Amino acid sequence: MEIIPAIDLLNGKCVRLNQGNYNEVTKFNSDPVKQAQIWESKGAKRLHLVDLDGAKTGEPINDLTIKEIKKSITIPIQLGGGIRSIDRAKELFDIGIDRIILGTIAIEKPELVKDLSKEYPKRVAVGIDAKEGMVATRGWLKQSKISSLDLAKQLNDLDLAAIISTDIATDGTLKGPNVQALREIAEISINPVIASGGIGSIADLISLADFADEGIEGIIVGRALYDGSIDLKEAILTLKNLLLQDAFNEKDKFLV
């Protein structure tokens, strides 16, 4: 299980939204390239990058910034936001993005997700962003008629890198993740699950570490890193030690 710091791009700046609301924007760093370097220096093994402009409009407004971030760090990047065509996906892979995250097209163009996952096995993730159990699309501005669990089941036939499960109601609130929703997704998904939304403390990370053996392989953290609620270096070490201790206890149990 890994902790993945998030950078959300809006007009070339590093920001966070509250519950996906574009009218509630907090700017944390006007230099997202520098921010990416900071997260790598603190031990991040992967970066979660979201093009909020792309998610809302479908247009690649932040491509220059994305390319600069890619050049400035050595860790792999997973990128989501406005990826709604094969050509766009190929553009991002060509500039060195490790994983793409598909959201809206998983609902609107499921065949496209299938085709991309075949052409790029284990390099396509699907973001299941849910509000009251129903999947939201178009930068969370529209509500679909499919539940998050039904979508997760439909994706079981695809060779995905991961499902990124976000509870919109908790995202950006620091009030803790929706553990029940995450467990339900992990239970029915063959693909690995990455948790996102609501992480506000080390205790929240520890609560999710208990489910590492149930298919939750990563935790995306955003606002809590920026406001100092969580120190990335400390969090990575804490989680590593906790998982090592769990593995030791499991091994010891069989030796008794």
From Swiss-Prot:
Q: Name one GO cellular component term.
A: cytoplasm
Q: Which gene encodes it?
A: hisA
Keywords noted in UniProt: Amino-acid biosynthesis, Cytoplasm, Histidine biosynthesis, Isomerase
| Listed name of the protein | 1-(5-phosphoribosyl)-5-[(5-phosphoribosylamino)methylideneamino] imidazole-4-carboxamide isomerase
NCBIfam families, per the entry: 1-(5-phosphoribosyl)-5-[(5-phosphoribosylamino)methylideneamino]imidazole-4-carboxamide isomerase (TIGR00007)
The record's section on InterPro entries has: Aldolase_TIM, His_biosynth, HisA_bact_arch, Isoase_HisA-like, Isoase_HisA-like_bact, RibuloseP-bd_barrel
Which terms in the Gene Ontology molecular function aspect does this entry carry?
Answer: 1-(5-phosphoribosyl)-5-[(5-phosphoribosylamino)methylideneamino]imidazole-4-carboxamide isomerase activity
The entry's active site is D8 (proton acceptor), D129 (proton donor)
Q: Which reaction does it catalyse?
A: 1-(5-phospho-beta-D-ribosyl)-5-[(5-phospho-beta-D-ribosylamino)methylideneamino]imidazole-4-carboxamide = 5-[(5-phospho-1-deoxy-D-ribulos-1-ylimino)methylamino]-1-(5-phospho-beta-D-ribosyl)imidazole-4-carboxamide
| Family from the record | Belongs to the HisA/HisF family.
**Pathway recorded for this protein:** Amino-acid biosynthesis; L-histidine biosynthesis; L-histidine from 5-phospho-alpha-D-ribose 1-diphosphate: step 4/9
Q: Which GO terms describe its biological process?
A: L-histidine biosynthetic process; L-tryptophan biosynthetic process
Which EC class heads this enzyme's classification? isomerase
Q: What is its EC number?
A: 5.3.1.16
Give the matching Pfam families: His_biosynth
Under Gene3D superfamilies, the record lists: Aldolase class I
Annotated compartments: Cytoplasm
